Structures are given as C-alpha cells and as structure tokens.
C-alpha cells in the first residue's frame, strides 16, 4: 500500500495493496471534509465551530449525525439510513463507561485510579480483565473463560515476551540499531 501527503503532512491519497485508491480533501482547519473511494462514492463531512464532526453524508444522503455533551464528548451517533443510534455514557472523569450500539447491546468499562481500563463487560455479561505494570503497560489480559495472555517488557519498555491464551510464547530480541 502507499500514501501521498500534502505540504502539511496530511494524507491526500491512499492506495491499497489491491490498487484501490481513496482520496481525501481537508478544510482550512485540517478536518477531512471529503472522502472519495475507489468506486467513486463520496462522503462529505461537516464540522461545528469547535471542529467536532457533526455529520457524514454519503453520495448526497445524510447518513450519520454526531451529538456531543457540554464537555465536548461524543454522546450519540445516529444513522438515518437505519434510524438507529449508538450512545456513550461517561463518568465524572470523562471516561466512557457504557456504550450502547445500534442493536441495543450494552458494553460496560471499568477503570482504575490511573484511568486505565481494568474490566470490559460485553452485552452477554462476558468480562475481560486487564492488569498493568507500574509503567501503564498491559501485562495480563484474562477473558470470561479464565484464559489469560501475558506480555513481558524489558527495562526499556519494549515487549520482551508474549504468551497467548493457549500458552504459546513469542520472544523478542532487539539489536542496537
């Protein structure tokens, strides 16, 4: 794949490995206002005065409308094609604690005192737990069935070893370059 950039370092064209191109246009604030895919479909995006995306219209039809709370946090995305809405609820610290998708499925997220995700619970009640080292790196992740994966880091914070849920390990070695 390849990317072409404008003089401001923004991607203006992406070409995939299958030679499918996507073009991007920006407003004076750096917001993507137009996206054209390899099939010629065009998505126009609009923004409010705070540069928050408020809508996406594809091929002239408004499809997505974004709403924000007083703190500027995205609280809903409405799809006019399906007439369904995704919503997000936040705690007092501005952390997303509950997400409801278009089908009504609720995902809940718990955080530790450092703001790190420690538990994610899906709509079926399945929880994934995360543990961190003192540097904020995820060192263990445990799924609802009790299967764990672990990541070990070296003194430089680089991944030294990963052990997946089946117990298979991959070790990493770094050179001086």
Q: Which ranges hold each PLM region?
A:
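Beta-strand elements of repeat-based all-beta scaffolds
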Residues: 1-16, 20-122, 126-143, 147-177
């Amino acid at each position: 794949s390849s990317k072409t950039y404008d003089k401001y370092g923004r991607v203006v064209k992406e070409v995939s490995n299958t030679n499918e191109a996507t073009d991007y246009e920006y407003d004076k604030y750096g917001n993507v206002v137009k996206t054209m895919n390899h099939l010629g479909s065009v998505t126009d995006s609009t923004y409010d005065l705070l540069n928050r995306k408020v809508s996406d219209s594809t091929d002239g039809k408004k499809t997505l409308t974004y709403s924000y709370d007083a703190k500027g946090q995205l609280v809903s995305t409405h799809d006019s094609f399906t007439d369904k809405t995704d919503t997000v609820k936040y705690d007092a610290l501005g952390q997303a604690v509950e997400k409801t998708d278009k089908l009504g499925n609720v995902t809940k997220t718990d955080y530790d005192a450092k703001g790190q995700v420690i538990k994610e619970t899906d709509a079926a009640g399945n929880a994934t737990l995360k543990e961190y080292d003192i540097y904020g790196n995820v060192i263990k992740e445990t799924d609802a069935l009790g299967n764990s994966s672990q990541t070990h880091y070296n003194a430089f914070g680089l991944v030294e070893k990963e052990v997946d849920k089946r117990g298979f390990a991959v070790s990493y070695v770094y050179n001086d370059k």
